[in-house]
Amino acid sequence: MENIENGILTLLFENNEVKIRTINSEPYFDLENVCEILEIENPRRAKERLDEQGVYFLFDYWSSKSQRKDFISESNLYKLILQSHRLENIKFAVWITSEVSPIFIRNKVAKKIIKDLEELRTKDLEELRRTQKS
């Protein structure tokens, strides 16, 4: 299942929600969701072991109670997976690399193609204007 609401993509991994937010064109994962899937009991303590630069927070204004939500970078996600020492979590890592990451890679490629086409169109229009003036 795929759902985008308030700029957050929600996917399902084995009936568990994984909320993903794009920050600076990179995927960031809801720390609480990740900890639940990896069976990490204390997300706050898990966050302390992560690279601070790969942790962003947002305030969840759209739910009934406004709360702070932490989102972690893909590298921090893998750090948590590797630190968990649970063989079952390999399935989650495989799902991320085979199903989730390609979504963002395709999105980056599409944005680059669109940008290149817009630049090409601008150059063509400029060239057309120059030839019409001559």
Residue ranges with predicted function:
Residues 1-119:
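An anion-engaging/catalytic patch
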Residues 115-134:
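Periodic self-assembly scaffolds
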